[in-house]
Amino acid sequence: MVSAAAGWAAPAFAVAAVVIWVVLCGELLRRRRRGAGSGKGDAAAAARLPPGSFGWPVVGETLEFVSCAYSPRPEAFVDKRRKLHGSAVFRSHLFGSATVVTADAEVSRFVLQSDARAFVPWYPRSLTELMGKSSILLINGALQRRVHGLVGAFFKSSHLKSQLTADMRRRLSPALSSFPDSSLLHVQHLAKSVVFEILVRGLIGLEAGEEMQQLKQQFQEFIVGLMSLPIKLPGTRLYRSLQAKKKMARLIQRIIREKRARRAAASLPRDAIDMLIGDGSDELTDELISDNMIDLMIPAEDSVPVLITLAVKFLSECPLALHQLEEENIQLKRRKTDMGETLQWTDYMSLSFTQHVITETLRLGNIIGGIMRKAVRDVEVKGHLIPKGWCVFVYFRSVHLDDTLYDEPYKFNPWRWKEKDMSNGSFTPFGGGQRLCPGLDLARLEASIFLHHLVTSFRWVAEEDHIVNFPTVRLKRGMPIRVTAKEDDD
């Protein structure tokens, strides 16, 4: 973990950025503390508001939130207020908006399960600029359900899982064999390289080559703008990211046009674009499809590689878990070799302890710390009023690290999932409701395949590395491990 000193020194730059952000965002000035109420102003409504404070004028409690986010324990912001107010649901003022923060599993589940008649997505302005109005993250109602359903169905398809499994095996085997004994393998870097190209092929059908490399470079330029200041002047971070997105969109829309021109009516979808254009809806325009293909590339750059990297870190720190995972995977490999069969995606997903390791990594790592929604009407839940126009911050991290829900929550313990129920609302690493991440099965599969090939190919000694939690979760050094190849009879 990052030292406490480093965790609290780093926010100096972030604090400056946040101050500029809040000053520049017009919405901040429109939502002063007194103007952020329910709009009714009556004593009864005020009494039902969650306990809490709006903090400082204009900036609210944003600066302390960001400072905690950079520390080894980002949940300290929420934990402090839970104790102070005696409630896991409290009010605050974050990123320019009056906000209800919930670390209550029941309230969080209610918000996630609610539809656009109660809550709609809310994101920082720079992110909404980059995502575009057609993004699955921002659209609502029937169109959102249609896009989510089509993409989710394709991601769950045996065709895509079989293709992804073969592609990962084809990429991982030579990549891992290129590391000689005692060399350093940076897990995060390798995972990003492998996962991105494979997922892009599944999304838009693009094969490895010059265009893939150009797309990868443009995507790198695009993604760093997601948490930038909302200034679109030439030369700014947001402007450069928007220009990169335009270049990606031109490539993807060309692919869409080519696919529409040659598409046979009865052909099976080979990628996500095929699935969407096959729906035949006039609402699924080329712009909407390209926007969503770009959005769906984000897990390949961010969440899936980080999931893999965190799993390796946690396993390296828990030799007993690493040994059990090795044994499970080696036994599967031997059994399939003796049968003369190639591992299929169902084989990887059948590895029960490997799945427990991935689940525990998701809980402890909290790759997605939480989500924000905006109330479109007054909403009441568990006696708390969330006024119309307020944001609600569903903070997954505090729920996943709640000692009333998990014994020794800061301990990596994959065995806890042998008996634990994942459907009770206290485990939500992929969100929930109509906006449940459509790629959750693929994320598990990719992590399972990577871990299988790693533990059956190498022994390793991990070098020291630290988790950085803000603005996104990552390993500071990319998780370097010093590898030694295993013999076939190991």
From Swiss-Prot:
InterPro entries: Cyt_P450, Cyt_P450_CS, Cyt_P450_E_grp-I, Cyt_P450_sf. It is an enzyme of class 1 (oxidoreductase). Pathway: Plant hormone biosynthesis; brassinosteroid biosynthesis. GO terms for cellular component: membrane. PROSITE patterns: CYTOCHROME_P450. It is found in: Membrane. Gene3D superfamilies: Cytochrome P450. Pfam families: p450. Heme binds at C437. It catalyses: 6-deoxoteasterone + reduced [NADPH--hemoprotein reductase] + O2 = 3-dehydro-6-deoxoteasterone + oxidized [NADPH--hemoprotein reductase] + 2 H2O + H(+). Its cofactor is heme. It is a single-pass membrane protein. Keywords: Heme, Iron, Membrane, Metal-binding, Monooxygenase, Oxidoreductase, Transmembrane, Transmembrane helix. Its main location: membrane. The chain crosses the membrane at residues 4-24. Belongs to the cytochrome P450 family. This is Cytochrome P450 90D2. It comes from Oryza sativa subsp. indica (Rice). The lineage of its organism: Eukaryota, Viridiplantae, Streptophyta, Embryophyta, Tracheophyta.
